Amino acid sequence: MRPNLWRTISLLSGRDGARAPLGRRSFLGLGAAFTGSFALGSTPANAEPASPPADAPWSQSIGAGVVDRPYGRPADTEAGVIRRNVPWLTAGTESSVSFSPLQDLHGIITPNGLFFERHHAGRPDIDPDQHRLMIHGLVERPLVLTMKDIVRFPSTSRIHFIECPANGGMEWRAAQINSLQFNHGMVSCAEWTGVRLSTLLEEVGIRNEAKWVMVEGADGAHMNRSLPLDKCLDDCLVVYAQNGEALRPEQGYPLRLVVPGWEGNVNIKWLRRIKLGDKPWFSREETSKYTDLMPDGTSRGFTWLIDAKSVIT
């Protein structure tokens, strides 16, 4: 018997170097040891000896320098991991959506370049030095803030999902596209950095009769929605950074609203105006689009909350 195998038997028996009787469990362990020993020792005589892998071409030359890519990007072999749209879904791309490739993502954070897009009048090109945020209406001290003013306020960072209420809509009537990306790709997650909306509202002073807040974007559609004041004072953020860098233009650069847990369209991008009032505004978007048509012909509005969904990637 091989010395190393006898050593194993000795350890299993609990007595180093002594040939003691084996119990049932030790005997089963001994059988496993024999099996492993014979398996390791049964290499055919004509088998090629194991050898280390050969050096690949990229291991035989000097790689690219540190300034080759001043702004990092994915490897060339990941070129297929991109947002995609469905050409026949809308008449044009300016009022449309692009889908995140959920099947290719890892963890919960969506890279900025893969965060889904939803525009109502295309992506504007905004000069942050010229951008302004006006807060007015039922307030004590109306304000017009520059981006430099906003970043001076105390900041906070939080991780939140944003989901379009139409996510999954490709399958509402019947299965149409055999693709996880197109069926469920209107949801993404990021770390957002900015100022609590409550902080800005405290700065202007809220009048007692104020109950609602209208938020408006600077895009060509002047996308706007009405929100209850209570929600705005709870957890809403006015953000200027996403995943550690300035917002991308398609995500609202230089300023957007994040309304945690509520449907994506209320997370107004390119935020330029906040107005406080005593009732909702019933804007075009929240009456003609973001309402629920009921079986009796009536419409149900202000159904902001996004229900939980699940999908296997």
Question: Where would I find each of the regions flagged by the language model?
Answer:
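Residues within well-ordered alpha-helical secondary structure of globular protein domains
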Residues: 30-33, 203
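Structured, non-membrane catalytic/scaffold regions adjacent to prosthetic-group chemistry
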Residues: 48-313
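Generic secretory/membrane-interface signal
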Residues: 40-42, 67
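N-terminal secretory signal peptides
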Residues: 1-22, 26, 33-36, 40, ...
